[in-house]
Amino acid sequence: RMAGRNRTEFYKLLSRHELDANDFKE
């Protein structure tokens, strides 16, 4: 499965848009 790769990309995006992610979380 490419879940691991998908997760890595997801985390990469989160790190890049940490502020956006934080706002989206709430």
From Swiss-Prot:
Q: Name one GO biological process term.
A: phosphorelay signal transduction system
Q: What does the UniProt record say this protein does? A: Probable member of a two-component regulatory system YfhA/YfhK.
| The protein, known as | Uncharacterized protein in glnB 5'region
Q: Name one GO molecular function term.
A: DNA binding
Q: What keyword terms does UniProt attach to this protein?
A: ATP-binding, DNA-binding, Nucleotide-binding, Phosphoprotein, Transcription, Transcription regulation, Two-component regulatory system
Source taxon at top rank: Bacteria
Q: What is the recorded post-translational modification?
A: Phosphorylated by YfhK.
